[in-house]
């Protein structure tokens, strides 16, 4: 019996070959009707025999394109219209809301990579080859629906051959919006740098050369043509870039979401030059390898890591260095892991294949500023760093850094992917957030402004949380401007104007100041404590509504009492929290100065615990010199000396005390090197649990029941130092003490309140030793452990947690 269905498919269904997929399976199942790409999703009218329609719908669910994500299939029986065939219709531009999910950018697929290196293919060595299964998506889109005219490809009318492919439902490039070739598409732009010239004047020079070339079609004698408009010119640009790289130079290379700075990953001098020019310090650099086999020579790649590093997202994956492999000084010194990735754009494939070895690929930006996306601006900003630029004339609409992930042992769950930085390949795919009451408007929008460091923002619409790509640290005007730019882009693209706002408690954060201004203009505001947001994020990702014990260990977060928190054990639900336990407060002499100089933190701990007279403490006092007296005065007088309960600062103090890292050059370095120094050991120092006798505080938000006292840890550490215990053992004992403190405080909370679920969050859980150890120990003690899934444990998840709390409080008020 024949029947007809109207079918709506919601999810990542645009720009991923979904309509040709529907077209092909409809023909296979003898279905007539049509498929339409609309702003709300993909609409299908299907007519056929009942069994054929059932099989058709089943295949939509089971065999959707790999780059797609089907979140929901809605079906409604409708009258037969007796269509005689199945067709693909054009987009419905009259749809009211932009609810379709936009695909992230996708790595070059195997088929396109094969064509890229096939001399018989018309796109041989074309640096922008793509199809419906790969290529740019979110970084080129201006508005929905995802059609070429609404992307940065609108400036490139297709040639006859590309247009034929684009219109053929049987072709892999059917409605591939970025489809192009040498004849009609974007091309490379080659610019060399005169380091003796002013950046702006040098830009005028290269633009004059480009103008001259455009007029007469020839470059200066002995010079590379500035535009790679054909195979010969494009290959010449690749060859020129490779020559500079082999000579130890630095190339700025335009990618999907911005520029990279590239140099030879095996050249110590090149790495030193890059670090000096970029003021990079000792922060580890990521390397891009030409092939998986080449990567395996240097790093251990398990099955889970291989799936990540070869998948469509192509993130940077943190991999264990292979014992005996040679790594150039300056790449990732002192660490057991290397951030590695494979090429994910055609240009990168060409560059890496021609170079024949790994290249450093680090973000093309100045220190603490956003990645550069515009060719002219990048030339000026990166002028003193790069020796040449490989840009292009395809505009980037939204800047994106590379994502960073790792694989950890997650106890009974086995191996799990831990997000470190969520950006290209993952955003803007929404993270589910099931906390909206049914009576609330499913399309109401909450905007969560996020934290100061590792900022993301979040647009919560219904149960879809659009967490932005990694923005960075909102401590300067350029990054704040990038935050505003990305916020406006998301709101316009998804037609989502916030009806309420969530932000951090800290009054001086730029994002919080923006939220306060919006509140003054009438928008409801929900302020969320930093560590509550951390735990709420884990709860929401795991769809937990019942109370949990939340362990939020990190470097800093504004506390309800005005102190700097960071070693918190909380009793949490979605709407509120009680502070159950925390590390005893330590002074931060000089505030930010103590964060940047762990020796100050070590001195403060020894001062607080009356251990400065211990013989092993002398080295800290000597290393600080006159600053020791300054620290003394600040601590004694309470001047410029905030108090902190931060677990991260404790690890910094231990690192400095052991001489592992006294002067870090990047955030987290002291703790990272402490972890790298630790060898597996069952020995542990002690962190004592004592009853909090403080009476000044009066609310559950700032008064804990239990204090975690690190005095025994530091006393035993000094004794071990005096006894010449190996640093590797002392580092392990400090880590094990942290793990034991987590378990013991959770056991005490469980005994008092009966809560058996523990949520772990905060930057300290970027530490593999502590994370894997805590999971194993907690599960061994009978707890269920919840971790972040799609979002990182660090501050990259804060905006999502803020949105979860704001939504839960709104539901509570409405009920």
Predicted regions and their residues:
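Intrinsically disordered, low-complexity, mixed-charge
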Residues: 1-182, 186-189
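Internal gly/pro-rich beta-alpha loop/helix module
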Residues: 63, 69, 150, 165, ...
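A phosphate-binding glycine/aspartate-rich beta-alpha loop in the early core of alpha/beta enzymes
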Residues: 77, 258-321
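A contiguous, well-structured pocket-lining segment that forms one wall/lid of small-molecule binding clefts
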Residues: 185-187, 451-481, 485-489, 604-756, ...
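Short glycine-rich phosphate-binding loop at a beta-alpha junction
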Residues: 252, 495-507, 753-764
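Conserved phosphate-binding catalytic cores of ATP/NTP-utilizing and phosphoryl-transfer enzymes
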Residues: 296-301, 350, 371-378, 402-403, ...
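Conserved phosphate-binding/catalytic loops in two-lobed NTP-binding clefts
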Residues: 504, 522-534, 756-761, 768, ...
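Glycine-rich phosphate-binding/hydrolytic loop that grips phosphoryl groups
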Residues: 531-553, 557-559, 598-607, 735-736, ...
């Amino acid at each position: 019996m024949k029947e007809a269905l109207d079918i709506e498919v919601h999810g990542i269904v645009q720009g991923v070959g979904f309509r040709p997929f529907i077209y092909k399976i409809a023909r296979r199942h003898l279905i007539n009707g049509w498929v339409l790409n609309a702003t709300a999703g993909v609409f299908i009218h299907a007519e056929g025999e009942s069994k054929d329609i059932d099989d058709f719908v089943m295949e939509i669910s089971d065999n959707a394109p790999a780059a797609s994500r089907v979140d929901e299939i809605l079906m409604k029986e409708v009258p037969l219209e007796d269509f005689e065939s199945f067709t693909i219709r054009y987009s419905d531009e009259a749809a009211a809301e932009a609810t379709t999910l936009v695909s992230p950018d996708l790595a070059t697929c195997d088929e396109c990579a094969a064509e890229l290196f096939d001399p018989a293919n018309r796109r041989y060595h074309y640096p922008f080859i793509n199809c419906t299964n790969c290529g740019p998506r979110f970084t080129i889109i201006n508005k929905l629906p995802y059609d070429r005219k609404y992307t940065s490809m609108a400036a490139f009318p297709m040639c006859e051959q590309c247009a034929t492919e684009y219109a053929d439902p049987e072709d892999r490039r059917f409605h591939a919006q970025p489809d192009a070739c040498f004849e009609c598409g974007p091309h490379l732009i080659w610019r060399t740098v005169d380091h003796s010239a002013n950046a702006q004047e040098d830009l005028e020079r290269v633009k004059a050369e480009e103008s001259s070339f455009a007029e007469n079609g020839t470059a200066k004698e002995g010079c590379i043509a500035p535009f790679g408009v054909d195979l010969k010119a494009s290959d010449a640009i690749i060859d020129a870039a490779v020559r500079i790289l082999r000579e130890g130079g630095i190339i700025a290379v335009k990618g999907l979401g911005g520029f990279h700075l590239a140099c030879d990953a095996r050249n110590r001098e090149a790495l030193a030059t890059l670090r000096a020019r970029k003021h990079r310090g000792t922060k580890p650099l990521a390397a891009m390898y030409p092939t998986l086999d080449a990567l395996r020579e240097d790093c251990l790649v398990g099955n889970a890591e291989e799936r990540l590093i070869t998948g469509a997202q192509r993130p940077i994956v943190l991999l264990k260095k292979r014992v005996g492999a040679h790594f150039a000084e300056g790449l990732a010194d002192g660490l057991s892991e290397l951030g590695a990735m494979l090429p994910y754009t055609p240009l990168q494939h060409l560059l890496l294949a021609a170079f024949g070895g790994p290249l450093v690929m680090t973000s093309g930006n100045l220190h603490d500023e956003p990645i550069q996306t515009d060719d002219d601006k990048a030339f000026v900003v990166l002028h003193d760093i790069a020796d040449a630029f490989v840009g292009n004339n395809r505009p980037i609409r939204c800047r994106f850094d590379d994502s960073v992930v790792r694989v950890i042992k997650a106890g009974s769950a086995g191996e799990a992917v831990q997000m470190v930085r969520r950006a290209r390949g993952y955003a803007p795919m929404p993270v589910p957030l099931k906390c909206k009451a049914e009576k609330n408007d499913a399309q109401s929008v909450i905007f969560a402004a996020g934290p100061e460091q590792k900022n993301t923002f979040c647009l919560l619409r219904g149960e879809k949380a659009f967490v932005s790509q990694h923005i960075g640290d909102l401590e300067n005007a350029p990054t704040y401007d990038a935050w505003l730019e990305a916020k406006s882009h998301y709101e316009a693209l998804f037609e989502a104007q916030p009806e309420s706002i969530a932000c951090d408690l800290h009054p001086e954060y730029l994002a919080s100041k923006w939220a306060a201004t919006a509140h003054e203009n009438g928008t409801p505001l929900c302020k969320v404590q930093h560590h509550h947001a951390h735990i709420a994020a884990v709860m929401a990702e795991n769809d937990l509504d019942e109370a949990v014990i939340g362990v939020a260990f990190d470097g800093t977060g504004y506390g309800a009492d005005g102190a700097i928190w960071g070693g918190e054990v909380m009793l949490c639900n979605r709407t509120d929290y009680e502070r159950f336990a925390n590390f005893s407060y330590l002074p931060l002499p000089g505030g930010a100065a103590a964060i940047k100089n762990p020796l100050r933190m070590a001195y403060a701990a020894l001062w607080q615990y009356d251990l400065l007279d211990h013989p092993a403490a002398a080295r800290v006092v000597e290393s600080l010199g006159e600053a020791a007296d300054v620290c003394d005065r600040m601590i004694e007088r309470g001047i410029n000396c905030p108090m902190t309960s931060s677990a991260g600062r404790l690890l910094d103090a231990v690192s400095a005390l052991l001489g592992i890292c006294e002067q870090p050059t990047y955030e987290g370095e002291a703790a990272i090197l402490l972890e790298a120094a630790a060898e597996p050991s069952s020995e542990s120092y002690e962190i004592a649990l004592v009853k909090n006798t403080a009476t000044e505080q009066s609310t559950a938000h700032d008064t804990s029941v239990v204090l975690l006292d690190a005095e025994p840890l530091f006393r035993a550490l000094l004794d071990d130092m005096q006894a010449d215990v190996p640093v590797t053992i002392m580092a392990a004992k400090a880590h094990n003490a942290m793990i034991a403190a987590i378990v013991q405080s959770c056991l005490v909370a469980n005994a008092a309140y009966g809560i058996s679920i523990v949520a772990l969050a905060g930057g300290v859980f970027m530490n593999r030793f502590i994370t894997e150890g805590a999971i194993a120990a907690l599960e061994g003690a009978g707890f269920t452990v919840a971790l972040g899934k799609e979002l990182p444990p660090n501050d990259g998840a804060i905006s999502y947690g803020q949105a979860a709390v704001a939504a839960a409080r709104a539901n509570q008020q409405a009920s």
